[in-house]
């Protein structure tokens, strides 16, 4: 397109395997990405707005400047990735895995994250991590490192939050 993006919008990409060093400037807007695997060092400047991401696996080192606004998916695996400036606002990512992620300057406002796991995740941000008006029912924030977070007007039923203070002592 005019901005230099590869346009893979509104496509059925079920069970595709994207492999390479860097995946950059790709638009997956409104695409069906069920059972897709991304295997690369970095995904940058990509747009997954309103995409269906059921059972997607991100085997990457880093996602940078990536948009997931209004994306929906069950069992999305982001584990062990650096999520740097990722916008998850208004997304529905249930039963998803954010375990051992380093999450920097990312937005989770208005998200539905039912039963997702952030075990041993680190929230490294210049400002507070934001989960404003999110549904965090049964979400596990277990042994996380977080300096400050905004959970204003969020549903937190059955949410578990335990903070790892080990580097303080």
Show the residue positions of the predicted features:
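Tandem repeat scaffolds
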Residues: 1-169
């Amino acid at each position: 397109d005019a901005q230099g993006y590869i346009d893979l919008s509104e496509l059925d990409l079920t069970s595709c395997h994207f492999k390479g060093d860097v995946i950059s400037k790709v638009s997956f807007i409104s695409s069906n990405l069920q059972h897709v695997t991304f295997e690369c060092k970095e995904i940058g400047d990509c747009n997954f707005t309103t995409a269906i991401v059921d059972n997607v696996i991100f085997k990457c080192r880093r996602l940078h400047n990536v948009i997931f606004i209004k994306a929906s998916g069950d069992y999305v695996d982001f584990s062990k990735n650096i999520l740097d400036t990722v916008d998850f606002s208004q997304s529905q990512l249930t039963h998803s895995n954010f375990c051992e992620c380093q999450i920097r300057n990312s937005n989770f406002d208005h998200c539905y994250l039912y039963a997702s796991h952030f075990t041993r995740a680190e929230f490294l941000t210049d400002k507070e991590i934001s989960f404003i008006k999110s549904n965090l029912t049964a979400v596990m924030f277990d042994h996380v490192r977080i300096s400050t977070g905004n959970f204003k007007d969020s549903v937190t039923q059955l949410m578990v939050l335990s903070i790892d203070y080990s580097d303080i002592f």
